[in-house]
Amino acid sequence: MPGILVRPDQSFEEAYRLFKKQVDRNLIVTEARARRFYEKPTERRKKEKIAARKKMLKRLYMLRRYESRL
């Protein structure tokens, strides 16, 4: 869980900015949105399979694009 220590000379805005940065780095908001509604295991596997295919096609596209430049 993110947390910061506020120094006496630190303003509220600065402390808030540091806290928001930690929250963004830890992907807390993204995970909370993903867990907002229950997702069945079959739906999760389906999404993972689609994401893996998309990633593989992107790598293949980039590889072919790189090879065509040689």
Swiss-Prot record:
Keywords noted in UniProt: Ribonucleoprotein, Ribosomal protein
Keyword Ribosomal protein appears in the UniProt entry: yes
GO BP terms: translation
Transmembrane regions: none
UniProt record similarity statement: Belongs to the bacterial ribosomal protein bS21 family.
GO molecular-function terms, A-Z: structural constituent of ribosome
Protein name: Small ribosomal subunit protein bS21
Gene Ontology cellular component annotations, sorted alphabetically: ribonucleoprotein complex; ribosome
